[in-house]
């Protein structure tokens, strides 16, 4: 289990094999290519699951009740960077 916190203070947990999901990779590639903007919602769901996605929405929700896509993109990028950093620092388990 990988645990982390974004720059804005959102605390999350990801399974070690979260990135080992071709559907997530496809959705991330679609975002990266400037493709369909709805891919961000799919990336968030595949990365965090329903409960954590709801918590993240509430975390970045504005006073008028909206969840800004720009803020969501920044949070997701921060989570993915954190996942990569923890992955580099993890110790492989003995076989």
Task: Give the predicted meaning of each segment.
Residues 1-5:
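Short acidic, Pro/Gly- and aromatic-enriched capping/linker segments at domain boundaries
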Residues 7-10, 15-95:
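Short, surface-exposed, charged amphipathic helix/loop patches that serve as local interaction elements
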């Amino acid at each position: 289990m990988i645990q982390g916190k974004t720059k804005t203070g959102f605390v999350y947990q990801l399974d070690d094999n979260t990135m080992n999901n071709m559907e997530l990779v496809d959705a991330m590639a679609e975002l990266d290519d400037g493709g369909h903007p709805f891919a961000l919602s799919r990336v968030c769901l595949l990365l965090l699951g329903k409960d954590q996605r709801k918590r993240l929405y509430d975390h970045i929700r504005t006073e008028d009740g909206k969840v800004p896509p720009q803020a969501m993109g920044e949070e997701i990028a921060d989570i993915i960077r954190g996942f990569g950093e923890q992955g580099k620092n993890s110790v492989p388990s003995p076989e």
